[in-house]
Each structure stands twice: as structure tokens, then as C-alpha cells.
């Protein structure tokens, strides 16, 4: 049983099966959807928060997609040994897209908040008060704006979707561009507010 957990473009698990089949022609891999194989291959994206990896490996739901139904069942049986959350079965492509969609969703929502902060700055509106008031609507939950998007995943994963379908990803691409441009906007605001010879201390900069 081989399980890929790394965030990957859609189709990566299938490519992995073909690579392994070429390297080991003596073994049968699920390269064409057949179940009569010796090696089962599946994709199950990791969903962990740095600093809480061990706890979330056990408690979080897992999306498990095999290249065949038998691959999915075998991988699901493995995760049920230690996962307390739900183990939800699907196919490999859907599981791959699921992880990319989760992080792209977060990126788009962060971009809305970041763009709102830029607009409010131009219109002389307190963005924090605005968001607090808007979120009093029972179906509105605007996130807090910041200096961009960090981490290993959110700033990277949306580009996998954009690359796979560039003509249909205008929103995802724009969100990435908004968040990528926010650090420069923040630096420019700081530079304009500083006096000549000012000293700047950066706390928590990594």
C-alpha cells in the first residue's frame, strides 16, 4: 500500500502509479483502473496545523481517494487504525482537488478582507469597525485583513488549480495577486509614515 499525502496537482497520484510501473515492471500497479494488482495506491491529503500535528493527525477527518475502489478501501482500513475523525472515501483526483480547494477557499476569503482594507484606507474608513459591523449580519463572516498570506500551503496551493485550468480561474488568480501584493502595500504605508532616520523594530518576523 502506497499513500501520497503531500499537496499535489490533480493527476499526480495517477502519474506516480505510472512512474512506479515503469520502474518495477515485475509488479502490477493500478495504472488503468484494474483491481487485479499487487500494489494499492491512494491519495489522502494531510490536514494538520503546525504545532498540533500529532493531535490533528488523529482527530481530523480524512479524505481518502484511491486509484481504484480496492485501493480506497485498503487505504481507508489503514487510516481507521488511528484516526478518530471520519474517514471519507472518494477517488484520487477528487481527494487531490479537495486539498487545493480548501486552501484556495481560505486564500480567496483572505484576499477579500485584504482588498477591503485597501479600499477603506483610501475612503478614510476604519476597516476593523466596518468588519465588526458587517459581521453582525447572521450570514456574513468577513475575515481579518493582514499583511498578506504566509505558511507553506495557502500561498502556493491555489497556483496548482490555476495551472491546471488557467482560462477558468480568474477569481483564484486575482485573489493570489491581491494577497501577494499586500506586503508591498503595507511596506509603502510604513515608509510614508516614517520620519527621516526612524528606527523600525520587527517583532515576530521569520
Give the residues covered by each predicted segment.
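Structural/interface elements that position substrates and couple domains in central-metabolism enzymes
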Residues: 1-206
